[in-house]
C-alpha cells in the first residue's frame, strides 16, 4: 500500500506524477518517490515523509522525461524509511517498479534471488519484483511482468518502467485496484481515479490477471496468456472540485458539511408510486421474501453502519441479522444457505477482508449485496446487486459523509426487505421515507446551530487521556462510531460501551474529570441512559450529552449538552453522528492534529 501513479505522453512526467501523488495523500502514507525515464536511463528519487518533501528535492533536478511512475507507501514490510520507499529498482538500475499489496512468498523468492547473486537494498517485499523482472526481461517489459507474476503469491497492483523501452509502462493487478485512462496528452495509470481526474473521466478498471502496455500513442490490453482483450470503459462523474477544499480549512469539515446533499442524493428516485425501488439489487420481491438470514459484513466505520442496520432489519423486516467484522467472518464457518443474504459494506469497495468474505460467502451459496461509494469497484463487480451511497469522493481518512451514506442506504435496504416480507404497509413506507428524507434538513440545522456547544465541550475534553462513549439501542451503535472518530484523528484513547454494561467493568475507569460522552436522545430507553449518567456523575465524570432539543432535564445530569432535532428513534443515528464527528474534529484541532491525514492510517485497506 498505498498509492500508484504513472504517466507516459507528450509532457514532462515529473509534475504530473507529483500532482497525482498529492491527490493520493488522503489515502495515508509514510514515504513517496518517482522514477522517470530521463534520456537513456532511469532517474529514481524517493523520500521519507510528505510528498512536499519529495517535490522540494525534485525542484533541484527538473527532469524532462515524459514517461514515469510514482508511489506513496504505507509500510507493510519494512519500517518507514527512504530505503524502503518505492520505486524499487533492479540490480543494474534498468527497471523500476511500484507496488500495492502484499507478496506472501517474498521471503522464499528473496532467498532464491540472493542465491543467484541479486543484491537487495531494502526490507520490502516489493523489491523481489524488480529482480524477477530483471531476470525475465528479454526486450518486452509486459512479457517479463507476466513471467514475474507467475511466481508471485499474494495481492498486487504493479506498474513498471525500463530504460530499454522508452515511453512504455507495463501494468497488471491481482486483488489490488488499478485504473487506466487515455487523456489528450498521454496515458495515465493510478490506483485511484482521483489521481487523473483532470485528464479523463473515462477509465478502464483493470481486472485480475489482465495486463496493459501503455505508450503515448495508445494502450494495449492482454490476458494472462498474452491474448488481446477488449477494455471495459467506465465513465466516472466526479468533479475536479472534489480534490479541493472549497474554502474549508480541511477536507473533513468540508465533507461533514456535504452530508445533507449525500442524504438527498442517496434517496433520489428511490420511492416510485409509493413503493421503494432499488433496481440495482436485481432481486424480485418474491426472491427477497425468501431471505431468512442476513449477515452484514464490514470493517471499521462501515461495521458501525452495519450495527445500525442490524437493529433496523430485525426491527422492521423481522429477519435474524448479524453484523460481523469481515476479517473474523471469513475465518469461521458461518451458517449460510441459498436463502442467506450477505450485505458487504465498504466505502472504497476494495477493502481486502470484505472482498475475501464476499468470495467465501458466494462459494457457500449466499446472495450478496454490496454497499459502496465507488462505481465499478471490486465490491460492486462481485456482488449480485449494489446500492451506491452517492457521497462522491471522500478525501479525509476518517469517514464522515460516506458513513452517513451507508446508514441511509442500509436503512433503505431494511425498508425494502420489510416491504417484501409484508411487514410494512405502503403507507408506512411512505411515512418512513418522508421522515428519512427530512433528516437532510435536520442535519443542516445541526451544522448551523451546534458549533458553540460542540467547541465548548471539546475545549473541556482536549487534555483528557481517555474517554468513554455510552448509549443504548441505536445510541450504543453510534457510540462505537463516536469513539472511533475521536481516537482516529485526535489520538485520544476512547472506548465505547452499551450503557447497560457500565456496572460490568467500565465504571471502574471513572474518576474526577473523566469524560463520558453519552447519546441521551429521547427514546424508549432514555430513562435508563439518564440513570447511567447519574452513576457516572456520582463518581466525578465530566458528562457530555447529545440530547433532543427541548430536553431541559438533561442539564441536571450533564456538564455539557449538545442539542439536536427530534427524530424517530430509527433515524437517530443519522442526526446523532454529526455532532460526534464535529466533536472529534474540534478536539483534534485543539490538540494540533492533522485531521485529514492522521498518523499510521490509510484511507483504503487493500491488504489483509
Regions found by a protein language model. Give the residues of each.
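Glycine-rich oxoanion-binding loops at beta->alpha junctions
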Residues: 70-83, 272-286, 309-345, 351, ...
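Hydrophobic alpha-helical scaffolding
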Residues: 7-10, 99, 119, 134-138, ...
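Structural beta-sheet core signal
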Residues: 4, 97, 160, 171, ...
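Active-site phosphate/pyrophosphate-binding segments
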Residues: 259-263, 267-295, 385-515, 588-608
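Generic C-terminus detector
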Residues: 226, 542, 555-557, 567-608
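Glycine-rich phosphate-binding loops that contact phosphosugars or nucleotide phosphates
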Residues: 289-431, 435-438, 519-564, 583
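Conserved short alpha-helical segments that host acidic/polar catalytic motifs at enzyme active sites
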Residues: 1-245, 249, 261-292, 331, ...
Amino acid at each position: 500500500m498505498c498509492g500508484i501513479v504513472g504517466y507516459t505522453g507528450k509532457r514532462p512526467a515529473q509534475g504530473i506524477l507529483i500532482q497525482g501523488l498529492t491527490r493520493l495523500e488522503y489515502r495515508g502514507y509514510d514515504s513517496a518517490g518517482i522514477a522517470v525515464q530521463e534520456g537513456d536511463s532511469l532517474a529514481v528519487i524517493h523520500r521519507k515523509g510528505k510528498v512536499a518533501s519529495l517535490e522540494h528535492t525534485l525542484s533541484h533536478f527538473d527532469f524532462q522525461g515524459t514517461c514515469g511512475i510514482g508511489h506513496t507507501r504505507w509500510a507493510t514490510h519494512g519500517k518507514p524509511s527512504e530505503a524502503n520507499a518505492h520505486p524499487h529498482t533492479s540490480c543494474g538500475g534498468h527497471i523500476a517498479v511500484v507496488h500495492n499489496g502484499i507478496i506472501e512468498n517474498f521471503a522464499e523468492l528473496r532467498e532464491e534471488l540472493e542465491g543467484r547473486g541479486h543484491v537487495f537494498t531494502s526490507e520490502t517485499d516489493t523489491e523481489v519484483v524488480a529482480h524477477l523482472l530483471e531476470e525475465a526481461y528479454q526486450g518486452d517489459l509486459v512479457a517479463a511482468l507476466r513471467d514475474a507474476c507467475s511466481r508471485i503469491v499474494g495481492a498486487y497492483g504493479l506498474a513498471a518502467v525500463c530504460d530499454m523501452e522508452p515511453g512504455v509502462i507495463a501494468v497488471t493487478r491481482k486483488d489490488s485496484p488499478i485504473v487506466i485512462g487515455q487523456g489528450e496528452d498521454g496515458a495515465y495509470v493510478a490506483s485511484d481515479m482521483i489521481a487523473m481526474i483532470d485528464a479523463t473521466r473515462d477509465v478502464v478498471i483493470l481486472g485480475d490477471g489482465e495486463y496493459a502496455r501503455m505508450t503515448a500513442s495508445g494502450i494495449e490490453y492482454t490476458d494472462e496468456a498474452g491474448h488481446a482483450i477488449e477494455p471495459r470503459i467506465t465513465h466516472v462523474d466526479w468533479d475536479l472540485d472534489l480534490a479541493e477544499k472549497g474554502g474549508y480549512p480541511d477536507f473533513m469539515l468540508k465533507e461533514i458539511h456535504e452530508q445533507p446533499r449525500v442524504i438527498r442524493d442517496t434517496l433520489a428516485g428511490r420511492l416510485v408510486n409509493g413503493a421503494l425501488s432499488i433496481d440495482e439489487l436485481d432481486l424480485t420481491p418474491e426472491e427477497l421474501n425468501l431471505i431468512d438470514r442476513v449477515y452484514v459484513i464490514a470493517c471499521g466505520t462501515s461495521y458501525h453502519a452495519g450495527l445500525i442496520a442490524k437493529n433496523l432489519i430485525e426491527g422492521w423486516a423481522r429477519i435474524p441479522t448479524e453484523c460481523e467484522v469481515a476479517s473474523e467472518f471469513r475465518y469461521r464457518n458461518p451458517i449460510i444457505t441459498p436463502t442467506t443474504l450477505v450485505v458487504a459494506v465498504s466505502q472504497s469497495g476494495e477493502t481486502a477482508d470484505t472482498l475475501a468474505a464476499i468470495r467465501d460467502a458466494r462459494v457457500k451459496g449466499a446472495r450478496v449485496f454490496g454497499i459502496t461509494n465507488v462505481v465499478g469497484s471490486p465490491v460492486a463487480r462481485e456482488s449480485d446487486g449494489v446500492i451506491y451511497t452517492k457521497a462522491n469522493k471522500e478525501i479525509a481518512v476518517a469517514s464522515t459523509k460516506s458513513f452517513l451514506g451507508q446508514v441511509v442506504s442500509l436503512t433503505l435496504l431494511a425498508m425494502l426487505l420489510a416491504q417484501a416480507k409484508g411487514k410494512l404497509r405502503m403507507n408506512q413506507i411512505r411515512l418512513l421515507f418522508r421522515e428519512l428524507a427530512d433528516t437532510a434538513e435536520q442535519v443542516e440545522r445541526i451544522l448551523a446551530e451546534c458549533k458553540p456547544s460542540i467547541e465548548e465541550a471539546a475545549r473541556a475534553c482536549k487534555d483528557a487521556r481517555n474517554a468513554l462513549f455510552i448509549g443504548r439501542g441505536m445510541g450504543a451503535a453510534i457510540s462505537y462510531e463516536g469513539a472511533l472518530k475521536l481516537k482516529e484523528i485526535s489520538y485520544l484513547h476512547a472506548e465505547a460501551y452499551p450503557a447497560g454494561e457500565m456496572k460490568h467493568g467500565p465504571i471502574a475507569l471513572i474518576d474526577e474529570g473523566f469524560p463520558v460522552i453519552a447519546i441521551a436522545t429521547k427514546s424508549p430507553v432514555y430513562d435508563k441512559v439518564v440513570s447511567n449518567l447519574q452513576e457516572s456523575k456520582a463518581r466525578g465524570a465530566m458528562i457530555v450529552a447529545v440530547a433532543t432539543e427541548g430536553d431541559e432535564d438533561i442539564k441536571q445530569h450533564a456538564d455539557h449538552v449538545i442539542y439536536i432535532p427530534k427524530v424517530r428513534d430509527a433515524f437517530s443515528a443519522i442526526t446523532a453522528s454529526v455532532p460526534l464527528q464535529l466533536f472529534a474534529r474540534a478536539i483534534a484541532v485543539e490538540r494540533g492534529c492533522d485531521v485529514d491525514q492522521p498518523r499510521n492510517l490509510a484511507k483504503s485497506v487493500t491488504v489483509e
